[in-house]
Swiss-Prot record:
Native source organism of the sequence: Drosophila melanogaster (Fruit fly)
Family stated for the protein in its record: Belongs to the PPP phosphatase family.
Domain annotation EF-hand: ranges: 441-476, 526-561, 566-601
UniProt keyword terms in alphabetical order: Calcium, Hydrolase, Magnesium, Manganese, Metal-binding, Protein phosphatase, Repeat, Sensory transduction, Vision
Gene3D superfamilies in the cross-refs: 3.60.21.10, EF-hand
SUPFAM superfamilies for the chain: EF-hand, Metallo-dependent phosphatases
Active-site positions on this chain: 220
Name of this protein: Serine/threonine-protein phosphatase rdgC
Function comment: Phosphatase required to prevent light-induced retinal degeneration.
Top enzyme category: hydrolase
Record domain IQ: where: 7-32
Magnesium in keyword set: yes
């Protein structure tokens, strides 16, 4: 081979390696955006848990008092006669009756896979939910699973409303049976659009094959989480005249879902993980039925909340493994812990287990080993963040408990038609849109901080100052230098035009995405039970009204134990503002109305800020070739999703050799 040919080969090799490195850097950057945003969002929601925890810890007299809202919500919901009414629109003519058998499963799959007209009659929805709750109630907290008869078992992770992935699993692996048992490891709903169908199908599978389907509870089997992440809105939109009754049945299902499973007494299957204080013996003895919501504590007559058992449930639902030693609070999620390999070894030794299968985290390949293969993460929702963002997977374990992984991507035909560049463009656009929506929550603060570094009002600041502001304000821990060209397009290599960043946040595609989302305040007001629980805790004398003295007592306790976390003066002023009729007391209606008005004012202020900015400061010209306009158009086009009937055969899958993985 002559010298020129060798040089050409080396040049091509260098170019290819640089290209591959750039692709991998882009993939990792997008993944970090998705994951950090997901954890930051859950951290917001976990603040509600923290608030309850602080109140109960420092107001122990409240923990033994009955929460009237919760107490009345669960007394007889399974025994009452259905008071369901007819729904408007198309209701499919599919009859479900007890006992549920395989023919009913086939009927449900055929109904649900259709893009349109996939609503069951509400009486059949109630039938499935009621019977499932009654049956689940009889199960232990930790379900024993055995391969003695079947010689194998399949474990699925998070599905998050991805009905297409569930149908792919059933198509590839077969329906449950005595020779083909399944464990579904929580997080059936939220985020995806077909959460109700996923939940109903899983519960129907359980009713049809009770000895071959095991359902574990995840952290999203919780009405507080559902209020934030879309499932409650999904049920309301599909059954607008019966959603309250259906959601009450769903709460009953949640409270009786088992907390985990143990396979052949050697493998623990739980949704999140564990901490250094987790005890399976204690978990087995907990009355799980009182934990309708993990994020909202149960308050019952004369029975103070046991924080130890509450923490046990919280840790197995919310925790994640870490590479470093020790057990520390999970600051990314704001709940649960990070547990290291030493914690895993100790936990397995104490409980005589071989390894643990958990879910709770999206992984690029659908699964991941950690802690010397003693922790296996399985995630079954493919295309979770965006089309092509990740593969889903499930595990098949044989009688020797050797795991075999099956990877898949649902709706494969949609990605086959796309080039790699197009797939990466879709993932990147989805990541940027989610990030921009999150940034809009801090838009005013971003603008104020940018201007501090621009005293001459030139519209430009240094790259380091731009990155510093982005991190200090959002606290997302992202590689901002890599994102600068995306979030401030069209700027030079030395300075950043921060107005480009602000203009991007005001584009139609970002405003529409923000409107489709739900804030913590939205979720809190939508889930009035949380507000009622807070009200009842502060109402020390159980009079049905909060006096200024009672409010001040609660504030004093919080301020004393958490200095700097709360401003007493500001909170007292907020209490006075809640007193709408000026009688010196705040009743429940005033308490709820104050939250509604506060959220309404917040939204009106956002609209006013947009109008003010459009006229109050010089904006970058919006032309067809303007960088911000081009980026917004790219995001809008690349995040367009067309719905089709679900075809479970439309998938790509392969079996992974566990030795190679």
């Amino acid at each position: 081979m002559d010298e020129n040919a060798i040089r050409a080969a080396i040049f091509i090799q260098k170019w290819y390696r640089r290209h591959q490195a750039r692709r991998e850097m882009q993939r990792r950057c997008n993944w970090q955006i998705f994951q950090n945003l997901e954890y930051a969002s859950e951290q917001d929601q976990a603040e509600l848990y923290k608030f309850f925890n602080d109140l109960i810890k420092h107001m122990p007299q409240a923990a033994g008092r009955k929460n009237q809202y919760q107490g009345s919500a669960h007394v007889s919901v399974l025994d009452d006669k259905d008071d369901l009414v007819e729904e408007f629109g198309d209701i499919v003519n599919a009859k479900i009756e007890l006992p549920i058998r395989k023919n009913h499963i086939d009927l449900l799959i055929d109904v649900f896979r259709k893009k349109r007209g996939n609503r069951l009659h509400p009486k059949y929805v109630a039938l499935i939910l009621r019977e499932a709750a009654k049956s689940l109630k009889q199960l232990p907290n930790i379900s024993p699973v055995s391969t003695a008869v079947s010689q194998q078992v399949t474990v699925c992770g998070d599905l998050h409303g991805k009905l297409d992935d569930l149908l792919v699993v059933l198509h590839k692996n077969g329906l449950p049976s005595s020779s083909n048992p399944y464990v579904f490891n929580g997080d059936f709903v939220d985020r995806g659009k077909r959460g109700l169908e996923v939940l109903l199908l899983l519960l129907s599978l359980y009713l049809a094959f009770p000895n071959a389907v095991f359902l574990n509870r995840g952290n999203h089997e919780d009405s507080v989480m559902n209020a934030r992440y879309g499932f409650i809105r999904e049920v309301e939109s599909k059954y607008p005249r019966n959603h309250k009754r259906i959601l009450a049945f769903i709460d009953e299902v949640y409270r009786w879902l088992p907390l985990g499973s143990v396979l052949n007494s050697r493998v623990l299957i739980v949704h999140g993980g564990f901490s250094d204080s987790t005890s399976l013996d204690l978990i087995k003895s907990i009355d799980r039925g009182k934990y309708v919501s993990i994020l909202r504590p149960p308050l019952t007559d004369g029975e103070p909340l046991d924080k130890t058992e509450w923490q046990q449930i919280f840790d197995i639902m919310w925790s994640d493994p870490q590479a470093t030693m020790g057990c520390v609070p999970n600051t990314l999620r704001g709940a649960g812990v990070w547990f290291g390999p030493d914690v895993t070894d100790n936990f397995l030794q104490r409980h005589r287990l071989s390894y643990v299968i958990r879910s709770h985290e999206c992984k690029p390949n659908g699964h991941e080993f950690m802690h010397d293969n003693k922790i296996i993460t399985i995630f079954s929702a493919s295309n979770y963040y965006a089309i092509g963002s990740n593969k889903g997977a499930y595990i098949r374990l044989n009688n020797q408990l050797m795991p075999h992984f099956v990877q898949y991507i649902s709706a494969a035909s949609q990605t086959k038609r796309l080039s790699f560049k197009q797939r990466m463009g879709i993932v990147e656009s989805s990541a940027l849109k989610e990030l921009a929506v999150r940034m809009r929550d801090h838009r005013d603060e971003l603008e104020d901080e940018f201007r501090k570094y621009d005293p001459k009002d030139s519209g430009y600041i240094s790259i380091s100052h731009w990155c510093k502001v982005m991190e200090n304000v959002t606290k997302l821990g992202l590689p901002w230098r890599l994102l600068r060209d995306k979030l401030a397009p069209g700027t030079d290599s030395q300075k950043v035009n921060y107005n480009r960043t602000l203009d991007l946040l005001d584009t139609d595609v970002i405003l529409e995405a923000e409107a489709d989302g739900m804030s913590v305040m939205d979720a809190l007001y939508a889930n009035k039970a949380s507000l009622v629980a807070i009200f009842n805790i502060i109402d020390a004398d159980n009079s049905g009204e909060i006096t200024l003295d009672e409010f001040e007592t609660a504030i004093d306790l919080l301020v004393a134990h958490m200095p700097g976390a709360y401003s007493k003066a500001e909170m007292l002023e907020k209490c006075r503002m809640m007193d709408l009729n000026g009688d010196g007391k705040v009743d429940l209606n005033e308490f709820l109305e104050a939250f509604r008005l506060s959220d309404l004012h917040r939204k009106e202020q956002q609209d006013e800020n947009i109008r003010r900015r459009s006229t109050g400061r010089p904006s970058v010209a919006k032309t067809a070739t303007d960088p911000v306009t081009l980026l917004a158009d790219k995001i809008s086009k690349n995040t367009l999703v067309v719905e089709h009937d679900i075809d479970p055969t439309d998938c790509e899958s392969k079996v992974i050799d566990p030795k190679k993985s």
